[in-house]
């Protein structure tokens, strides 16, 4: 159950108010001329404290973690994606990409006509799960911190849902950007 649902339930039933999740902003302090490329990419990125990259990141790390009010997380975080991640990449109408992901989505009843809906739905679920801390840390390197977020969509050709992992990059100030709309089951 998300924090907001727990808060609402506590208010309705007169229960103890739950503690807000602790979010942190990674701050890279420039205390020397040597800078870790990974720490530079993490600068001002937001993470749930219990689901953040290891800190300190290395033996000579000058970074600090600053508190962020959960209200700021709820109101300022955003999930974005390029339409091109869905059309032409995901649905691959000209067979430019060897991934065959379009066959999987076609088997669930989706076509390129659904690309905009999928983009909106994946952004919506990605944002909701990110602010709830429901993400898995992935690779961290000079490109930045990757996270995986599981989403669920209805099959268009059956009365059931399908769940899969989406891949994202974390950027400063609560922004996550879709790297791949389908990263695996």
What are these language model-derived features?
Residues 20-31, 35-41, 119-185:
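Functional cores of ribonucleases/endoribonucleases
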Residues 1-60, 64-123, 127:
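Domain-core detector
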